[in-house]
C-alpha cells in the first residue's frame, strides 16, 4: 500500500464535553460507536475506505478549510479554564497532507494566543462542533 492508500493517525487533546461532541459527530457520520476504542493507538496509519477514518479525514479537511473562521469564533478563554487533568487524548485519521496543514494551523494558534495545544485543540473543535468546552 502506498501513502495515498492510508490515513495518518494523530492525537488531539480535548475537554471531556468537546470529546463527547466529537464522539457523537463521528457516530452520526460513520456509525463509530466509541471513538476512544476505534483506532489502534499503536498503529501509525489506517487504510483508506475505513468508515471512521473517512469521517475523521473529512472532519480534518473541514477544519483546515474553515480554520480562520473557527479561530475567530473559538472561545479560548473557556478552553483555558479547563482543568489541566480534564483533557482527553483521542486519535483522528486523515490524509498526511491534511494532518500537516492542521498541525501548522494549531501551532500558529498556540503562538498567537500564547497558549498550549490542548487549549487550541479544544477551542477550535468546540467551535466546529458547537460544543461548550466546559462542563457546567
Spell out what each predicted region is.
Residues 1-136:
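Acidic, polar-rich N-terminal leader regions of halophilic archaeal proteins
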Amino acid at each position: 500500500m502506498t501513502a495515498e492508500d492510508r490515513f495518518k493517525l494523530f492525537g488531539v487533546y480535548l475537554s471531556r464535553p468537546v470529546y463527547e461532541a466529537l464522539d457523537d459527530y463521528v457516530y452520526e457520520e460513520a456509525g463509530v460507536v466509541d471513538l476512544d476504542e476505534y483506532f489502534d493507538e499503536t498503529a501509525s496509519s489506517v487504510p483508506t475506505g475505513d468508515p471512521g477514518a473517512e469521517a475523521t479525514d473529512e472532519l480534518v479537511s473541514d477544519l483546515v478549510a474553515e480554520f480562520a473562521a473557527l479561530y475567530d469564533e473559538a472561545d479560548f478563554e473557556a478552553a483555558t479554564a479547563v482543568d489541566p487533568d480534564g483533557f482527553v487524548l483521542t486519535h483522528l485519521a486523515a490524509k498526511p497532507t491534511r494532518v500537516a496543514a492542521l498541525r501548522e494551523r494549531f501551532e500558529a494558534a498556540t503562538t498567537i494566543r500564547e497558549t498550549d495545544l490542548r487549549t487550541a485543540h479544544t477551542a477550535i473543535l468546540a467551535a466546529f462542533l458547537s460544543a461548550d468546552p466546559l462542563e457546567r
